[in-house]
């Protein structure tokens, strides 16, 4: 802003009448007439000539008229007497924010990082069986990997067993396969542990072999005469 303060000493300079001891503000492109009014004019950079802007009652009005013409001729880089209202507001707002932040010392809390690793999140849910989701009230979809149970039959052949029904708390845990010991006799008859079963099988065995007794022969003796 081109403002000049002059202390008048009662002399007449440049057409401005000044009184003793009174400061006068001088604006760019503004002249004061002898009868007390203010004239505004600007130089046209294209035509290299002066452009008359008018006569105003106050020096501030004449200075504003000059600022408007200067922005039209030279754009935003023009030298003016007053800054734009938007520039004043933005400057005052930024200075107010800086002063308030410096006085109070309050800083905005940093944002927590987002959880982007979905595989680790699902893996943790699947490991504890979804207990964390139920405790925190979140809805989760755990992924369960069912493990087979290995059992061995008496003949030595391994068998893989899968639990088709999911039960809480029994995830990824192999289920035992109970194998009862069984004894096999030489004659193919089951010789189990249960005494009732063994007794009944013994009776059946005796009944089966009653009618199939062998011939009592001694090979060291001569055969009988009836043969």
Curated annotation (Swiss-Prot):
Induction: Strongly and quickly induced by ethylene. One of its GO terms (molecular function) is DNA-binding transcription factor activity. GO terms for biological process: defense response; ethylene-activated signaling pathway. It comes from the Eukaryota. Residues 26-83 bind DNA. Expressed in roots, mostly in root tip, lateral root tips, cortex and vascular tissues. InterPro entries: AP2/ERF_dom, AP2/ERF_dom_sf, DNA-bd_dom_sf. The AP2/ERF domain binds specifically to the 5'-GCCGCC-3' motif. The affinity of this binding is higher if the seventh amino-acid of this domain is basic. Contains a slightly degenerated ERF-associated amphiphilic repression (EAR) motif, which may be involved in the activity of transcriptional repression. This is Ethylene-responsive transcription factor 4. It comes from Nicotiana sylvestris (Wood tobacco). The lineage of its organism: Eukaryota, Viridiplantae, Streptophyta, Embryophyta, Tracheophyta.
């Amino acid at each position: 802003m081109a403002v000049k303060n002059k202390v008048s000493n009662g002399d007449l300079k440049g057409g401005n009448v000044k009184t003793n001891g009174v400061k006068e503000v001088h604006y760019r492109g503004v002249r004061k007439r002898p009868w007390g009014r203010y004239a505004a004019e600007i130089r046209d950079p294209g035509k290299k000539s002066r452009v008359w802007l008018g006569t105003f009652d106050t020096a501030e009005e004449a200075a504003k008229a000059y600022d408007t013409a200067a922005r039209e001729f030279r754009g935003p880089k023009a030298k003016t007497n007053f800054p734009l209202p938007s520039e004043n507001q933005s400057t005052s707002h930024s200075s107010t924010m800086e002063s308030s932040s410096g006085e109070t010392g309050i800083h905005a809390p940093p944002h927590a990082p987002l959880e982007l690793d979905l595989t680790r999140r699902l893996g943790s849910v699947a490991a504890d069986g979804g207990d964390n989701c139920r405790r925190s009230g979140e809805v989760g979809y755990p992924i369960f990997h069912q493990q087979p149970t290995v059992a061995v039959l008496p003949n030595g052949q391994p068998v893989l067993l899968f639990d088709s029904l999911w039960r809480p708390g029994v995830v990824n845990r192999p289920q035992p396969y109970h194998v009862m010991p069984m004894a096999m006799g030489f004659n193919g008859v089951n010789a189990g542990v249960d005494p009732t079963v063994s007794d009944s099988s013994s009776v059946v065995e005796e009944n089966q072999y009653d009618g199939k007794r062998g011939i009592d022969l001694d090979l060291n003796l001569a055969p009988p005469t009836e043969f």
